[in-house]
Structure formats: structure tokens, C-alpha cells
A protein has these predicted regions:
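S-adenosyl-L-methionine-dependent methyltransferase catalytic core, i.e., the SAM/SAH-binding region
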Residues: 1-141
Length: 141
């Protein structure tokens, strides 16, 4: 899909969302079009707004800004954000393993508080856009 969008963009610039939809539409099954289009627009928004870079920068600052006992509460709205938040809270960095100190002990700045919280049925009924929200809470050690 990306290669088709890029090749079409070389022929005619994409100036409106309608232009992009016209490129995407023939590439997707009609019953899944809305899902595919949403993902394309989400990817563009994430890249244009540098959302993952901003989140990473924010998380890196929290271990220095929060005092011991301070709480970090982060709501993520899609899997890329949630993975970053989860790894940072669990490992103190963005990789899959935590850093070790000179003695081989894991050195993490946060302690996870409870489980991830998702919207209740009542919240979903009142606010459908909350369906993908995940709240993670950690305490500075």
C-alpha cells in the first residue's frame, strides 16, 4: 500500500484527504476500507506530529523530574504508544530488557502500580472514543 501511495504521489501530488482516499480505496476490500483508511491516516498523524518522539522525550524526563514516591500516570491510545510506556515502566528504558548496575542488579526507576486500566462498559457507552485507551501507573523508586 505504501509503495502505491508513493508512486501515485510522484505522478500527482496528494493535496486533500479525498486524493488519498481515492488511492487507498482500490487497494482494500470494501468491507475493511474504513479500518485500513483509519490506519493510514493514523500513521500519517503519528509521523507528522512526531508523537512517538514526543512521548519518548517525555518519558525520559519523568525519571529525573519525579521525586521518589511520585506517580507517573500515562494514557496511551494505540499499541505503539502502549508498548513504549510499558517497556519504560518495566525496564526503565525502551528495550526489552532492564539495565543492570555494577553488581548485576536490575536498575529501574519505577515500580509498576497495579494492572493496566481500560475503560469500563459505562465509560465506553458514554465515550466511544475511549475504547482504545489504556492507563498505566508507576511510582518513582
Amino acid at each position: 500500500m505504501v509503495s502505491v501511495i508513493i508512486s501515485n504521489r510522484k505522478i500527482n501530488p496528494i493535496t486533500t484527504t479525498h486524493d488519498l482516499i481515492n488511492i487507498i480505496k482500490p487497494l482494500t476490500p470494501s468491507r475493511f476500507f474504513r479500518k485500513y483508511a483509519s490506519k493510514v491516516f493514523q500513521a500519517i498523524r503519528i509521523e507528522v506530529n512526531k508523537e512517538l518522539d514526543v512521548l519518548k522525550s517525555f518519558l525520559e524526563q519523568t525519571s529525573e523530574l519525579l521525586l521518589p514516591g511520585g506517580r507517573l500516570c500515562v494514557i496511551s491510545y494505540h499499541s505503539l504508544e502502549d508498548r513504549m510506556v510499558k517497556r519504560y515502566i518495566t525496564n526503565g528504558n525502551f528495550s526489552t530488557t532492564a539495565k543492570k548496575d555494577l553488581y548485576g542488579n536490575f536498575s529501574v526507576p519505577f515500580k509498576k502500580i497495579g494492572k493496566m486500566i481500560q475503560p469500563s462498559a459505562v465509560e465506553l457507552k458514554e465515550n466511544i472514543r475511549s475504547r482504545s485507551a489504556k492507563l498505566r501507573i508507576a511510582e518513582k523508586i
